[in-house]
């Protein structure tokens, strides 16, 4: 079998922190174990890092000059000659397959242009991570984003040779708004289970709050994640229950200062923010906690942080959004809420605070569920079938 040359255009790539970034990095790590694949990544250089590096088993990463026109939406710096030089150099390589991820990133449009707007077209596989239209603070930006989705986004779905959804929620969103193809496959991500299991719990947090039940959230701090509803739920708890618990918010983002203000007198007195931490530290904090809260609004495909918390054996309180209703089985491995309102989150928290045995049962079941359903060997095998179909 000849080598298949694959280039991926992700919206972001590490060291930028997020579920998409780890998804792409772990996917390429496991795919690159097969020497029949020659893998390239072309991504915005945010935050500024090495312009070129080789990762895993000869995965070649190119990071081009870029900036964020609004938070979480990078665009190439078209005024920098280096961007154009890097982009046009890609045309010197005879790729078999181009992979884009998430329709609304400018890098997805770049990948589409590279694959389809040329004399010798390339096979394009689009992997969608989103399950709702973009919601921003500005109504004008929301309308602009919706228009982009319904024009450029829809074109990408229609012209792609293959479309993959990362969850059922994503597939339903695609079918309702872009293309009517019920054969779109759902391929769940894997998890680095051995790596997660090798990380110990955060002993400082465990010791400092040894007499408290520890609630935890991990993720990028922006409106989509619904963290303000966790804080409101905490504040609204009866005083006797509040005295039994603490809330640890792990992550950073444009909403960090707003959320700190919302915490009010409970900031560093019941509600604690870690700011930006690396993967190992985040997992260590989750392991030191007792309950993990997933508070997302509709939008994401399948929360990596939620899956990782389940892998850590934590009892889950989850809104039904961002794929949670596909992995959290109410009354078996967690509490699946009706929505992400403060009232619902409060209900879930109270139920688990008052029942230590239930927390242990849910946590054990969550861990087993992840081990049985989310492994990269299975995921990569499904992608390989698609790649081989496209090139043969």
Curated annotation (Swiss-Prot):
User: Which keywords describe this protein according to UniProt?
Assistant: Glycosyltransferase, Transferase
Under the heading CDD domains, the entry gives: GT4_PimA-like (cd03801)
Q: Which Gene3D superfamilies match?
A: Glycogen Phosphorylase B (3.40.50.2000)
Give the Pfam families listed for this entry: Glyco_transf_4, Glycos_transf_1
Q: Which InterPro entries match?
A: Glyco_trans_1 (IPR001296), Glyco_trans_4-like_N (IPR028098)
Could you tell me the EC number(s) of this protein?
2.4.-.-
Q: Name one GO molecular function term.
A: glycosyltransferase activity
Q: Which PANTHER family match?
A: BLL3361 PROTEIN, GLYCOSYLTRANSFERASE
Similarity section: Belongs to the glycosyltransferase group 1 family. Glycosyltransferase 4 subfamily.
Its recorded name reads Uncharacterized glycosyltransferase MJ1069
**Species of provenance:** Methanocaldococcus jannaschii (strain ATCC 43067 / DSM 2661 / JAL-1 / JCM 10045 / NBRC 100440)
């Amino acid at each position: 079998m000849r080598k298949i040359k694959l280039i991926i255009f992700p919206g972001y790539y590490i060291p930028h922190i997020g579920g998409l970034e780890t998804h792409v990095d772990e996917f390429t790590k496991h795919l690159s174990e097969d020497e029949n694949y020659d893998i390239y990544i072309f991504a915005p250089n945010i935050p500024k890092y090495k312009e070129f590096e080789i990762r895993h088993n000869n995965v070649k990463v190119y990071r081009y000059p870029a900036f964020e026109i609004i938070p979480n939406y990078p665009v190439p710096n078209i005024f920098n000659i280096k961007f154009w030089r890097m982009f046009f150099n890609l045309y010197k390589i005879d790729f078999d397959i181009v992979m884009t991820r998430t329709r609304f990133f400018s890098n997805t449009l770049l990948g589409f242009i590279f694959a389809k707007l040329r004399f010798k077209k390339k096979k394009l596989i689009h992997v969608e991570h989103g399950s709702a239209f973009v919601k921003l603070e500005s109504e004008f930006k929301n309308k602009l984003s919706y228009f982009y989705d319904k024009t450029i986004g829809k074109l990408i779905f229609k012209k792609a040779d293959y479309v993959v959804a990362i969850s059922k929620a994503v597939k339903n969103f695609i079918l309702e708004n872009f293309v009517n193809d019920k054969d779109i496959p759902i391929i769940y991500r894997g998890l680095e289970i051995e790596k997660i299991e090798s990380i110990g719990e955060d002993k400082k947090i465990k010791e400092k709050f040894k007499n408290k039940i520890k609630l935890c959230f991990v993720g990028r701090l922006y409106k989509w994640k619904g963290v303000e509803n966790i804080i409101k739920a905490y504040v609204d708890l009866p005083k006797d229950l509040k005295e039994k618990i603490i809330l640890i918010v792990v992550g950073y983002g444009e909403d960090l200062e707003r959320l700190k203000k919302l915490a009010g007198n409970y900031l560093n007195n019941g509600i604690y923010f870690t700011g930006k931490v690396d993967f190992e530290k985040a997992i260590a904090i989750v392991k030191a906690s007792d309950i993990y809260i997933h508070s997302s609004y509709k939008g994401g495909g399948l929360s990596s942080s939620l899956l990782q918390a389940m892998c850590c054996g934590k009892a889950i309180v989850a809104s039904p959004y961002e794929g949670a209703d596909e992995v959290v089985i109410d009354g078996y491995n967690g509490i699946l809420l009706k929505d992400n309102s403060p009232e619902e989150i409060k209900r879930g928290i109270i139920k688990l605070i008052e029942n230590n045995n239930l927390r242990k049962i849910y946590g054990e079941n969550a861990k087993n569920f992840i081990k049985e359903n989310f492994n990269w060997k299975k995921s990569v095998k499904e992608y390989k079938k698609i790649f081989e179909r496209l090139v043969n």
